[in-house]
């Protein structure tokens, strides 16, 4: 077993993926981790998206440490922007998605209309901005100052995907039997926000892919493998916490594998761990292929390696402990 990928929330009897061959640690981290955490705390004072001081402290800590590992070579201001984007998504999901959204999906749908309005380029939503709307406007303004029009369009498209993913998850949370395993695997990258993080990489690190490179098979396969890996290891790491909080974790990879294969929890974890290891190997192979040639493709491969490594690292953080 790989200690880097094991979390204390998972009972020792349950298998966890061994990712040492594909993503060996230790993982490099930016020297700005503490600065990111301090900035994140201040940003959440300016835009009070989280009411609980304990939750705020936990989220700013994992964000500071996680973003420092996601883009370890990025500049300080770029790291702040990436952290704030992750804070917004996570705080919105905690406040309006999951169990809250499942209790009233129609209200969640009405809430998201303000953000769709802003993402479409309208500066003032009808009725004025909420605190989440004001925070999103701040993020979009700052990102727009750094990004090309194409990069900005990609980010806003992924943010819309995230909003849809949160709504999708809330809609199905109390009726997971309606969700097939292929449906879940297709949606999970959007609910774990990893494709949005990947979409920021070019701006964070100062490179730009051509459209032919972006649509090439090696890049698409690498991004898919990293997106899958992020969601799946998150599901394994958070399983015990979700079970302790809600009594079950029925809309997640282990539960869906148990239903699909009519197996017990240990076998589901074993199957999920193998899935993680296989996708990690795919990602590592594509990273090696793309870094060999240099240029923006190599920059992108290095960025994806750091993104994947950050998910491998952060699943052991206290945010996932019961």
UniProtKB/Swiss-Prot annotation:
GO molecular function, one term: metal ion binding
Annotated keywords: Lyase, Magnesium, Metal-binding
Residue sites binding Mg(2+) 3 per the record: 234, 238, 242
EC numbers, comma separated: 4.2.3.193
Gene3D superfamilies documented for this protein: Farnesyl Diphosphate Synthase
Biased segments, Polar residues type: 1-11
Keyword Transferase attached: no
Residues noted as binding Mg(2+) 1 in the record, renumbered to the chain: 93, 98
Binding, substrate: 188, 241, 319-320
Record function comment: Involved in the biosynthesis of the labdane-type bicyclic diterpene labda-8(17),12(E),14-triene. Catalyzes the conversion of (+)-copalyl diphosphate to yield labda-8(17),12(E),14-triene.
Name the record gives this protein: (12E)-labda-8(17),12,14-triene synthase
Organism of provenance: Streptomyces anulatus (Streptomyces chrysomallus)
């Amino acid at each position: 077993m790989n200690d880097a990928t094991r979390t204390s929330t998972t009972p020792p009897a349950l298998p966890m993926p061994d990712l040492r061959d594909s993503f060996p640690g230790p993982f490099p981290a930016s020297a700005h981790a503490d600065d990111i955490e301090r900035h994140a705390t201040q940003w959440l004072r300016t835009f009070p998206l989280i009411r609980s001081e304990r939750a705020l402290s936990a989220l700013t800590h994992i964000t500071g440490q996680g973003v420092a590992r996601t883009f370890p070579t990025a500049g300080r201001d770029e790291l702040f922007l990436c952290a704030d984007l992750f804070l917004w998504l996570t705080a919105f999901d905690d406040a309006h998605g999951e169990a809250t959204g499942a209790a009233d999906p129609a209200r969640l749908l009405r809430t998201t209309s303000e953000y769709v309005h802003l993402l479409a380029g309208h500066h003032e939503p009808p009725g004025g901005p909420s605190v989440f709307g004001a925070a999103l406007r701040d993020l979009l303004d700052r990102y727009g100052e750094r990004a090309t029009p194409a990069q900005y369009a990609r980010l806003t498209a992924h943010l819309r995907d995230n909003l849809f993913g949160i709504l999708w998850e809330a809609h199905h949370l109390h009726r997971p039997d309606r969700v097939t395993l292929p449906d879940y695997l297709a949606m999970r990258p959007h609910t774990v926000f990893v494709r949005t993080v990947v979409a920021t990489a070019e701006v964070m690190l100062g490179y730009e892919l051509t459209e032919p490179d972006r649509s090439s098979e090696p890049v698409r396969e690498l991004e898919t493998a990293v997106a899958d890996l992020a969601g799946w290891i998150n599901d394994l790491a958070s399983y015990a916490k979700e079970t302790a909080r809600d009594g079950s974790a029925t809309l997640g990879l282990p539960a869906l594998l148990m239903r699909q294969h009519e197996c017990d929890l240990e076998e589901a974890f074993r199957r999920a761990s193998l899935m993680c290891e296989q996708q990690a190997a795919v990602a590592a192979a594509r990273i090696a292929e793309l870094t060999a040639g240099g240029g923006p493709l190599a920059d992108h491969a290095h960025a994806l390696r750091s993104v994947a490594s950050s998910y491998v690292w952060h699943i052991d953080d206290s945010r996932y402990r019961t």
